[in-house]
Every structure is written in C-alpha cells, then in structure tokens.
Amino acid sequence: MEYLAHISDDKTRKQTVLEHSQNVAMLAKQYADVFEAGSWGYCCGETHDIGKYSDEFQERLKGGKLVDHATASAKELIARGGMYSLAAYITAGHHAGLPDKGTDADDAGRGTLCGREKKKIPNYQAYKDEIKIPELERPKRMIGKNAFSMAFFLRMIYSCVVDADFLDTENFMQEGKTNRQPGIITEELWDKLTSYISSWLACKDEDTVNGHRTQILKSCIKMGAEKPGVYTLTVPTGGGKTVSSLAFALQHACVHKKRRIIYIIPYTSIIEQNAKVFREILGENIVLENHSNVKYEEGDELNPMQLAAENWDKPVVVTTNVQFFESLFSNKSSRCRKLHNIADSILIFDEAQMIP
C-alpha cells in the first residue's frame, strides 16, 4: 500500500509520507547544523509524520474525519528513552504546539506529553517498512544542566522541524512555484554599504558634526573586525548611529561568516525610519520589516516579504522587542518558525535601555 502525506488541491498530484519525511529531515538537519545539532533536526524531521502510516489518516485525505497523526512519533520516541524522550516534545507538537510534560496522573484526554503517551491512536506500525528511526547524537555545544537551557534547545530544534515541514508542504502544494526569495549576508551587501558611505569616509573635518559622525563610523567599522562578543554603541542624536551600527554589523558578518543581521527595536516609528535607510542602502528585497504596522497589498498570493515574515529568512530583519521576545518564549509553530534563523546571526538591540 502507498501511504500519502499530501494530495494537491486539484487531486492530480500526490506526495508520499516517505518523500515528505525525507525532505523535512534533510532541511531540518540543514537548519540545525548551524548550531551543531543536525542529528536532532534529521531524526525529528524523519519521524514527525509516522502517524500518517494509518488507514484512518489515508481516509482523512479523502475527506474522512480528523485523525491525530502527531502522537505516534512521540510514542515511539518516548519508548526509546533517553534523549529520544526529549525529542518527543518536538514531534508531538509539530502542529498543536510544544506541549507541557504534565505528570503521570494525566489521563489520555490531557494535551500534555504524559497524557498524549496514554492516548489511543490508529495503528501506524506500517511505518517500519519504510522509515527507520535515526540515531541521535549528543549536542556538541553545551546545553547546560538547567531546565531553561534544555527547553530553549528543544525550541530551536522545534523551529527547524516546523519550518522545514511548512516549507516542504508549501513547495509541494504550489509545485515549487512560491514567491520566496530567501537570502543571507554576502560581500555584495558590504560593497553597497561602502559605496553609500564613501562620501562620509572622505570627510577630513575633525570638529564638525560631520567630522564626528565620520569618526564614529570608522570606529564601528574597525570594531566589526574584532572577535564575536557583546558590544555597546553609545552615540548622541545626529551622530549617525543607524548607518554606523549597520557598518559594524555588515563588517562583522562578512569577517565571521554570520548569516543575517537582526535589529530589535522598541518603537515602530524607529523601526520604520531605520528600515527605510537600510532599504535605501541595501535594496528593497534585502530588508524585512516585521511589525504590526506593516501593510501588504492583498492578492491571490503572498508576496516575498509576507512569506519572509513567517520565518525571517532575509539578510536583514528589523522587528520589535515584542515580536522578538514573544517568539523566543512561544510554544506555537507559527511563532517559533523563525527561531532557527536567529542562530549564527548578529543581534542589535536599539534603545536597549527600554527593555524591561
């Protein structure tokens, strides 16, 4: 029997569970490799949909009743024990959101991981004919012994898996014809910036406003070549902080091969001003402005920036404190999709004193 994961809207095309699982596994591994946890992305991606290996789910694709297909993977991973029990959180929540653990007293009706483990679900054992649960490697980076570190690590893997799942499903349903235009920092962006600031750097004044602005800019460029760490920039109003901070970030990204720059700013008015400058320097398609005031033209298809707002896969992202921190601590797939793209990025907190 052929087990399907998706059927196109016009009913003419099919994607098997095996094909979808392998696609998600490879993409999730690619994302998790950035923070040296590729085996976790691969394992969770490969197993997340094994619950679709049931007759009931196959009937669901033909219009049948709803079927829980996410619990199956969690059951299999929990049965393996050890690190796999942690991976179970990710596959259990790839649609409904990361669950709480709960307690052994929870019954099957509870949405906790302990409750889900007791839930009766359709027989899915046919998965064993096509999918083998991959090996999990211990994370190479120290996670820490506290619960917060472990929870955040799992949230990052969750982000890799749900984004890969969304993207592969989207790619199948739209036959690869999406409007996505992902990108990372390149030397070309540095060239655009140096062209923009060439007149600033040519300034020979020392005691004028322009002269001080030039010195601040040069200092930022110099510091951009230093090793990764935590840096502060204090500049008076009119000192060119917006361009100077971008110069630091682009220099740092090019020297240390960082993937993107994320600006986190408290006020939308400041975001709009900064994003306008960044677009003027780098180009319209490079800068994602992500906050509640952004309006998009309505149409049959989402434009590239609307799509990028789902997972922050643009070279430069400008967003609010609220958007950033709510995403960091969310358990919902829609908010967590973007988290893996924070890894190996440069974070700039503007007006950092405004953080509560």
Regions found by a protein language model. Give the residues of each.
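Accessory nucleic-acid engagement/destabilization modules that flank
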Residues: 1-196
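Conserved pre-motif I regulatory segment
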Residues: 17-20, 197-234
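Short basic/glycine-enriched coil/helix segment immediately N-terminal to the Walker B
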Residues: 225, 310-314, 333-345
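Walker A/P-loop
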Residues: 227-249
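The Walker A (P-loop) glycine that initiates the GxxxxGKT/S ATP-binding motif of P-loop NTPases
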Residues: 235, 292, 351
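Conserved Walker A/P-loop ATP-binding site and its immediately adjacent core
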Residues: 244, 249-250, 257-281, 294
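Inter-Walker segment of RecA-like/P-loop motor cores
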Residues: 282-329
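SF2 helicase catalytic motif II
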Residues: 321-325, 335-356
